[in-house]
């Protein structure tokens, strides 16, 4: 439609909407809105809409396919509405039906959407019984009888779809349809048409069957002369016969459709196959019998040619099977094999296979194939079972899986048909379950599932159940690596685990429930229990065996240990016993091992008589002691009140010791030596079974050692000891430990024999191997000179063996054997520090075991171990070879444990030795920060808690002694106090804590713990001050390390050393006073650490200080008596240091430092003061700013307290403090604290300090800022500095800037340096100046100068470079230009500081809310910002106002424009409210301000004139009516004159005039308002549409004000209100918030003038108190309806006025106009609709539909047209 054509009806509007949708078809939002609008119109005027759509399609024959589809979809949506069906005109519907059929016939094969839209129209109408006959008639018109050419494909599909949605509507026409179809089908040649006809015939058949179901009475007729037809495969439904009505026609159709199976198109073949299947349920039974061969032989081959049509073919076959299997009449047997072969591949798909993505059709086809087998099984179950068993023998996994799954499905789904096939199934599955049948894991898992199904149906009890058992047992374990490599297949670990779990569960189920379980499983399972491959499933086998024995015992039968045990494959009793004991290894470690041990222990107890008749008693200990112990150790969580959770490593050690004790008891009760040797031999043979299981092998070696200790045959012992060495993999740590502990166990009974054999083993290193790793030859060979890795690990095992042999040595011979034999032998190895790490670790462990063995508490007496220092030297040599930061082994941990054990031996270490060993340990351990991965998991293997701890060995000592030894260093924040107030720290155990060498800790944590124990033992052996100073000297350098872990470790060790010294000090005499030398150094370095970032360091530092002061008190001769004057540790922590793991708050830091400074001042001797200060100065540069600040505070307290004694050092002290300022500038608090000490000195040189600071560059550095702050806080300096500054600043403002030539005739104002400097200083000194009274006296002058500064420099800039030749230092730096942006920003900063100083927070808040601080920097907005500031002072600080105004009086007549401007700003700001000092009204001040503004109305400056008009407008808010009455006329005249200001080119004065008038009209009497009203209304009307949103907002506001004053009695204003109401409503949703708000206010204030109650109610509800509506669209909808109903004579005026805005430049206004138009014209009565100028309005809306700028405009126009549905 052309843009210039006139639109006058709804029909034209609908046509325009359709044109819009087709024009903007790619804009989904527009298209969707048009569709929604058409839907709305269609729900009210469906006939008009349908007529419009009909005409549109007819008038636009060349419209594109997608566009025509949209129109048809619109029709479909309209007629699909149930509410409008009754309104539809039948003639129009007939036209639409004909249109749809014509459109359908016009489509091509590619026009899918167009054709489907046409079909949707017809189907939608056909769903209704009113129109279904018309639709089918219309369709049949396109399908005349006798036609040899098929109708359009979508005509056929439409009939099919109608049959699906309304079968009862179509079936009455079916005879006619089929009569036309039958002669036509043979002429259908194209594949798409054949597909359509096949689909339609399927739908026809389904419709007939559905009608039979819904109307069974109509289906009571029987077939005449033929068998009845079933409707299901089960044959249980009643026979129905109304299909007979169509039997002849369907047979004719069947003949034609069947020929389509031979089509070349795969989809046609699939559709034809499904259709043939459906027709099989419709044709006569005799015909089906005749065509069985034809159907089978033609449908089966279709699978080979199908692509995606398999599902349709399978459905067709399924329907055929339903018809053929209902009884025995159909001769299907000859073809069953072919049918199954065709269906079976479809059943072989695995929907659970995640490696293959199956389509939805494939999954449906799979289910349909299963259904086919299910249907066929109702008649041919035995044939199907044979078939499936045969398929299971196929080599392809998919074939096997398919057969297994189908068989399982039949067992579960068609059980009644499979009952008599039990023996057939059992025998048929033997080959599948046989061992030689190697299949994949997926197939095996499917077989297991089939076995479960067989067990559920009691098939396993029958003959052949042993094959099932063998299969399950065989698949308990996966293939070996060799087998997998031979098959060249990737091992599916997850699949193997699932298979094992399924097999184990199936075996247990059989053992627990099967009647013949004992016959099947006993002793068959014993063949596998000792097989290496079955090691992972020993627990499952034991469970089954134990269950069998329990069932036999419960049944009162004895186990048969004879029958079947002659089988060589069945394991013997010794082998089983050894195997079961090895299963106890690491039982508490996890649930799997616990379950294995529990089952093995239960089996040992159950079959104990089989092992030996005398073992039944000891075997009972399993349930009495060991099983409860296992339950206890398996518990991982302890309750809150219970003992701490035991370490996992200690649990395993306890468990192993208990098991070995049980083994020893079991062996001891057997008197026969041969039985013991047989058991040991069986253990030796099983060592090779655990090549890959080091933990089990290590435990078996220990078991073998315990067993050999009970054997007296020496040669047997020697042979098996050698076997232990040869079988152990010495490169594995756990096996080394197991071998060494096993040898130690043997040594308890054969000490001499073991020592001799160990020497023989040591000679292996010097012999050439002839075979294997440790083979050796008899002939003489030279000694090897090159290292061998196997020999290295053997050497490590040998060293460990000697350690455990020493521990096993009897106490009466240990010293002699050690000195004469063992040490002499080991010294050759110990002396070589260059050996490999593994050997050094073993030697350190051996040293520790030796020291433990000869500890005085163990052997008694005062025997001295002379080789102690020698061994310590070896340990130091080993440590020195390590890298401090990198932890790669357990060598350091073992060295600490060795040191802790050796230092306990007599005699005590010398000071030199202490320093030497302490330095080496500390240097190698404290810096550790990285460790090699994997060390953590070896922790409990390396350290066997049962015997490796020095302290656990001496458990017989006193409890107090044990507690002292076991107290670890502090690692958590738990705090308590002892009897003397001494801090005692304990580690949180169990929950979140890491104890000792637990495997939950890292090796690094365990190493630190052992390091602490080593230092503790050093102090305990030599508890003197000298020892403490040596150790502290080593630790002090680590207090200030940057690395957290080094500080933590250093203070931890310090606390540990001081605590242990306090407990054991021997150089303290009661009554003898002496200095505690480490006191000053510790206090100087640890006191600042009280506010370390780490809470742990803080608490430990305080603990160290407490211990230090306690020790100093002891050294005064008081002994260990309580020092009543010493601070309470817990009280100090609670008061100052309680902050959790985060850093302390600033106030708490100061309080803590002040408190500790007072303590130090009281307790530090003057003789140690110099050392203390030196330490403090070192701490000033600590890496942590909080710590350096604390040091500075301590320095301040020290200077203040003892300054009189430091006169000679005062100058040096101050100099150092000033020098430190640059070094500590990063720490503000440190600067502050250092400057605090500087203030006392600065008082005497105040003038010099000021002069120097004036010359510092701007912006001031942190140091200079802090200096000014310190100076201003001094009460003597503050007032003098202020007076000096104000004088200098006032003089500098006479010439605040210079004009600089920028080139090209352009100059720029550049601010001078002096005013900036003085303002910057002023900003600093007013921050914290004292006293405040001095500041308040000078406050008016300061504010005046700052406001003057802003006015003077508002349009200036900073100098970019310094003047040439200037010798003054550079003050205005680039940093200042970046920080302050503009010079006025410096005054803003000063004002902020001043307000903060005077606690005028509300003034700051007022400025923040108005964003006035930012406006101060803008040359156009600074006046408003100052106004906000002055008015805030009036409200918050009235006492400042009068002095400020008085100070400004001298500026009023100044020649300087900035001074006059400042005076006018103050005067204008005080018009609204002028107050005296007490906050009351000050009329005198107000009059002065008004006069000042009146006098300035003629000022040459435009901004001053503008400000005067604005200020006089504020007179409306004045509280004095007298003053208002005196000056309001003058103010109004001034505002009116401002409307015509000739210099006002940008309407700035005009805007202020309108705003002033807006305020003043409230104060003007009616006569005066009436006199100016015509002029104001004339002036204001154009302002509504000005581009300036500020002017629009002011105009709307003034209009509202005028109306509220004179509108009630002025008909003239009422007329203007109706004229302007449209503008108010449209701009209520203006682009700018200010305009929207003013419109809302005006509408709210003027609603009474409309004299419409409904309008008033609506406005008061939606625009309450002048607020904007919550939803503009909803408000316009309601209000427009009210306007139309209230003022029907003006509705056309409103509509035309609104249409004028259709061409507005604002897209939002155009949207609003469209919306308002739609709402105004919605729901009008017929007479009112007749008054509307339709052509203008409708044409404008249509133009908006084509808006090219904004899509929202088109959407709004579309929505508006939807509301015009009544304009038809």
Curated annotation (Swiss-Prot):
Subcellular location, record wording: Lysosome membrane
InterPro entries assigned: ARM-like (IPR011989), ARM-type_fold (IPR016024), HEAT_Maestro (IPR055406), HEAT_MROH2B-like (IPR055408), Maestro-like_HEAT (IPR048465), Maestro_heat-like_prot (IPR045206)
Top-level taxonomic group: Eukaryota
Each HEAT repeat, start to end: 4-47, 164-203, 816-856, 1166-1204, 1483-1521, 1731-1768
Keywords, ordered alphabetically: Lysosome, Membrane, Repeat
UniProt KW Transmembrane helix keyword: no
Biological process per Gene Ontology, one example term: lysosome fission
GO MF term (any one): membrane destabilizing activity
A cellular component term, taken from the record's GO annotations: lysosomal membrane
Pfam families: HEAT_Maestro, HEAT_Maestro_2, HEAT_MROH2B_C
Function: Lysosome fission factor. Recruited to lysosomes by rab-7 at scission sites and homooligomerizes to mediate the constriction and scission of lysosomal tubules. May sever membranes by inserting amphipathic helices into one bilayer leaflet. Lysosome fission is required to maintain their steady-state number, shape, size, composition and function, and to accomplish regeneration.
Quaternary structure note: Homooligomer; homooligomerizes at lysosome scission sites.
Annotated family: Belongs to the MROH1 family.
The protein's name: Maestro heat-like repeat-containing protein family member 1 homolog
């Amino acid at each position: 439609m052309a843009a210039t054509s006139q639109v006058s009806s709804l029909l034209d509007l609908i046509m325009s909407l359709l044109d819009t949708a087709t024009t903007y078809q790619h804009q989904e939002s527009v298209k969707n809105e048009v569709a929604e609008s058409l839907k709305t119109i269609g729900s009210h005027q469906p006939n008009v809409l349908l007529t419009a759509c009909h005409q549109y399609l007819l008038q636009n024959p060349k419209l594109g396919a997608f566009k025509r589809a949209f129109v048809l979809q619109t029709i479909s949506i309209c007629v699909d509405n149930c509410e409008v069906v009754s309104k539809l005109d039948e003639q129009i519907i007939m036209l639409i039906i004909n249109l749809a059929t014509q459109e359908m016939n016009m489509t091509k094969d590619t026009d899918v959407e167009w054709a489907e839209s046409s079909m949707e129209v017809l189907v939608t109408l056909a769903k209704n019984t009113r129109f279904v006959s018309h639709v089918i008639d219309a369709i049949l018109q396109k399908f005349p009888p006798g036609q040899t050419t098929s109708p359009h494909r979508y005509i056929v599909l439409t009939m099919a779809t109608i049959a699906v949605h309304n079968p009862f509507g179509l079936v009455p026409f079916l005879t006619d349809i089929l009569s036309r179809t039958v002669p036509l089908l043979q002429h259908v040649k194209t594949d798409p048409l054949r597909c359509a006809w096949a689909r339609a015939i399927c739908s026809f058949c389904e419709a007939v069957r559905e009608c039979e179901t819904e109307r069974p009475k109509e289906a009571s007729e029987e077939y005449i002369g033929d068998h009845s037809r079933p409707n299901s495969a089960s044959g249980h439904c009643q026979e129905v016969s109304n299909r007979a009505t169509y039997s002849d026609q369907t047979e004719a159709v069947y003949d034609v459709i069947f020929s389509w199976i031979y089509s070349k198109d795969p989809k046609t073949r699939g559709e034809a196959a499904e259709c043939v299947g459906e027709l099989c349920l419709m044709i006569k039974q005799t015909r089906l019998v005749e065509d069985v061969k034809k159907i089978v032989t033609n449908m089966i081959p279709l699978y080979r040619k199908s692509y995606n049509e398999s599902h349709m073919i399978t459905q067709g076959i399924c329907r055929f099977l339903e018809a053929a299997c209902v009884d025995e009449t159909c001769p299907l047997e000859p073809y069953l094999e072919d049918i199954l072969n065709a269906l079976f591949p479809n059943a072989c798909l695995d929907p659970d296979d995640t490696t293959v993505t199956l389509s939805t059709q494939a999954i449906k086809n799979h289910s349909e194939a299963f259904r086919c087998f299910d249907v066929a099984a109702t008649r041919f179950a035995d044939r199907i079972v044979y078939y499936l068993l045969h398929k299971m023998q196929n080599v392809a996994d998919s074939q096997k899986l398919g057969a297994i799954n189908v068989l399982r499905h039949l067992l579960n789904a068609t059980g009644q048909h499979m009952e008599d096939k039990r023996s057939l199934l059992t025998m048929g599955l033997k080959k599948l379950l046989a061992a030689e049948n190697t299949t994949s894991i997926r197939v095996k898992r499917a077989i297991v599932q089939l076995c479960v199904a067989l067990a559920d149906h009691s098939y396993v009890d029958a003959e052949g159940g042993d094959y099932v058992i063998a299969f399950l047992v065989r698949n308990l374990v996966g293939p070996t690596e060799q087998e997998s490599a031979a098959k060249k297949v990737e091992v599916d670990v997850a699949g193997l685990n699932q298979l094992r779990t399924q097999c184990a569960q199936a075996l247990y189920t059989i053992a627990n429930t099967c009647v013949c379980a004992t016959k099947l499983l006993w002793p068959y399972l014993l063949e596998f229990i000792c097989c290496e491959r079955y090691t992972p499933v020993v627990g499952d086998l034991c469970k089954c065996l134990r269950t069998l024995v329990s069932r036999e015992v419960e049944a009162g039968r004895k186990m048969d240990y004879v029958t079947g045990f002659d089988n060589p494959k069945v394991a013997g009793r010794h082998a089983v016993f050894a195997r079961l004991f090895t299963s106890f290894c690491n039982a508490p470690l996890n649930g799997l091992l616990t379950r294995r041990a529990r089952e093995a222990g239960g089996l040992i107890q159950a079959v104990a008589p089989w092992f030996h008749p005398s073992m039944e008693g000891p075997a009972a200990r399993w349930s009495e002691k060991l099983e409860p112990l296992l339950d206890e150790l398996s518990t991982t969580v302890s309750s809150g009140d219970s003992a701490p959770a035991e370490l996992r490593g200690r649990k395993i050690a306890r468990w192993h010791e208990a098991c070995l004790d049980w083994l020893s008891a079991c062996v001891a009760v057997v008197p026969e030596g041969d039985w013991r040797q047989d058991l040991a031999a069986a253990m030796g043979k099983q060592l090779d079974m655990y090549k890959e299981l080091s933990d089990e092998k290590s435990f078996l070696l220990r078991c073998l050692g315990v067993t050999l200790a009970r054997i007296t045959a020496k040669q047997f012992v020697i042979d098996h000891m050698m076997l232990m060495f040869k079988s152990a993999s010495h490169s594995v740590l756990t096996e080394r430990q197991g071998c060494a502990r096993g040898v130690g166990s043997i040594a308890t009974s054969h000490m001499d024999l073991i020592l001799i054999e160990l020497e023989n083993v040591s000679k292996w290193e010097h012999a050439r191997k002839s075979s294997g790793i440790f083979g050796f030859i008899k002939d003489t060979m030279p000694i090897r000179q090159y290292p061998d890795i196997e020999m290295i690990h053997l050497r490590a095992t040998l060293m460990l063996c000697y350690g455990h042999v020493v521990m096993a040595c009897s106490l009466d011979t240990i010293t002699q054997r050690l000195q004469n034999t063992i040490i002499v032998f080991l010294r050759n190895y110990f002396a070589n520090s260059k050996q490999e790490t593994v050997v050094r670790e073993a030697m350190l462990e051996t040293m520790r075991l030796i020291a433990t063995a000869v500890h005085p508490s163990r052997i008694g007496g005062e025997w001295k171990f002379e080789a102690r220092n020698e061994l310590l030297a070896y340990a130091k040599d080993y440590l020195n070879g390590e890298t401090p930061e990198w932890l790669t082994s357990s060598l350091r941990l073992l060295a600490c444990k060795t040191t802790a054990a050796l230092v306990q031996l007599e005699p005590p270490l010398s000071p030199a030795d202490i320093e030497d060993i302490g330095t080496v340990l500390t240097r190698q351990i404290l810096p550790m920060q990285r460790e090699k991965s994997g060390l953590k998991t070896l922790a409990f293997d390396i350290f066997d808690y049962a015997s490796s701890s020095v302290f656990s060995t001496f458990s017989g000592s006193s409890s107090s002694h044990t507690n002292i030894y076991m107290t670890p260093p502090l690692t958590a924040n738990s705090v308590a106090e002892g009897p003397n107030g001494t801090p005692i720290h304990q580690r949180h155990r169990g929950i979140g804590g890491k104890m000792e060498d637990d495997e939950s800790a890292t090796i690094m944590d365990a190493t630190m713990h052992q390091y602490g124990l080593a230092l503790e033992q050093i102090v305990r052996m030599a508890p003197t001050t000298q020892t403490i100073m040596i150790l502290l000297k080593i630790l002090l350098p680590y207090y200030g390390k940057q690395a957290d872990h080094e500080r933590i470790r250093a203070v931890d060790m310090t606390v540990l050393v001081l605590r242990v010294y306090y407990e054991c000090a021997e150089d303290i005499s009661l009554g003898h006073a002496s200095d505690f030398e480490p006191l000053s150094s510790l206090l100087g370095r640890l006191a600042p650490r009280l506010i370390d970032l780490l809470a742990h360091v803080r608490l430990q530092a305080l603990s160290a200080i407490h211990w230090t002061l306690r020790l100093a008190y002891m050294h005064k001769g008081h002994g260990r008596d309580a020092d009543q004057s010493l601070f309470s540790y817990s009280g100090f922590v609670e008061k100052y240091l309680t902050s959790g793991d985060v850093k302390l708050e600033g106030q708490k830091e100061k309080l803590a430092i002040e408190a500790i400074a007072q303590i130090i001042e009281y307790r530090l001797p003057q003789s140690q003061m110099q050392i203390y200060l030196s330490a403090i100065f070192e701490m000033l540069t600590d890496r942590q700013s909080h710590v350096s600040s604390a040091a500075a505070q301590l320095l301040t307290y020290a200077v203040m307290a003892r300054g009189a004694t430091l006169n000679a050092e005062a100058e040096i002290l101050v100099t150092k403090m000033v020098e430190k300022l640059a070094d500590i500038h990063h720490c503000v608090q440190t600067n502050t604290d250092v400057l605090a000490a500087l203030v006392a000195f600065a008082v005497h040189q105040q003038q010099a300090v000021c002069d120097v600071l004036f010359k510092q560059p701007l912006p001031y550095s942190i140091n200079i800022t802090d200096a000014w702050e310190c100076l201003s806080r001094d009460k003597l300096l503050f007032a003098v500095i202020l007076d000096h500054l104000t004088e200098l600043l006032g003089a500098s403002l006479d010439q605040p800037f210079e004009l600089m030539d920028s080139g090209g005739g352009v100059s720029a104002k550049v601010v001078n340096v002096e005013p900036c400097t003085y303002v910057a200083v002023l900003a600093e000194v007013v921050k914290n100046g004292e006293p405040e009274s001095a500041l308040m006296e000078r406050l008016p002058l300061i504010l005046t100068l700052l406001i003057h500064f802003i006015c003077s420099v508002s349009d200036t800039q900073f100098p970019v470079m310094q003047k040439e030749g200037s010798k003054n230092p550079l003050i205005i730096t680039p940093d200042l230009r970046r920080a302050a942006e503009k010079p006025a920003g410096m005054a803003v900063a000063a004002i902020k500081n001043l307000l903060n100083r005077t606690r005028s927070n509300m003034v700051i808040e007022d400025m923040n809310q108005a964003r006035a601080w930012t406006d101060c920097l803008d040359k156009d907005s600074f006046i408003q910002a100052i106004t906000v500031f002055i008015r805030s002072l009036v409200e918050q600080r009235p006492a400042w106002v009068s002095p400020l105004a008085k100070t400004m009086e001298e500026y009023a007549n100044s020649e300087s424009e900035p001074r006059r401007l400042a005076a006018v700003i103050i005067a204008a700001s005080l018009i609204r409210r002028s107050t005296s000092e007490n906050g009351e009204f000050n009329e005198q001040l107000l009059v002065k301000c008004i006069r000042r503004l009146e006098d300035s109305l003629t000022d040459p400056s435009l901004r001053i004139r503008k400000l005067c008009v604005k200020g006089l407008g504020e007179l409306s808010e004045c509280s004095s009516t007298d003053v208002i009455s005196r000056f309001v006329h003058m103010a109004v005249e001034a505002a009116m004159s401002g409307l015509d200001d000739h210099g006002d080119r940008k309407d700035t004065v005009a805007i202020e005039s309108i705003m002033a008038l807006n305020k003043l009209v409230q104060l003007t009497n009616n006569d005066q308002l009436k006199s100016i009203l015509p002029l104001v209304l004339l002036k204001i009307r154009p302002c509504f549409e000005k581009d300036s949103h500020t002017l629009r907002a002011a105009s709307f506001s003034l209009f509202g004000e005028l109306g509220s004053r004179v509108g009630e009695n002025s008909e003239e204003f009422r007329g203007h209100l109706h004229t302007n109401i449209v503008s108010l409503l449209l701009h209520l949703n203006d682009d700018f918030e200010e305009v929207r708000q003013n419109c809302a206010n005006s509408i709210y204030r003027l609603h009474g003038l409309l004299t419409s109650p409904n309008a008033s109610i609506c406005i008061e509800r939606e625009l309450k108190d002048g607020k904007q509506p919550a939803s503009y669209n909803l408000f316009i909808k309601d209000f427009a309806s009210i306007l139309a109903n209230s003022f029907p004579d003006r509705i056309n005026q409103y509509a035309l006025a609104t249409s004028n805005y259709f061409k507005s430049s604002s897209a939002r206004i155009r949207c609003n106009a469209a919306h308002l138009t739609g709402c105004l014209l919605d729901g009008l009565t017929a007479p009112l609709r007749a008054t509307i100028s339709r052509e203008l309005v409708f044409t404008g809306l249509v133009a908006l539909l084509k808006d090219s700028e904004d899509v929202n405009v088109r959407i709004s126009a579309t929505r508006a047209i939807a509301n015009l549905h009544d304009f038809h």
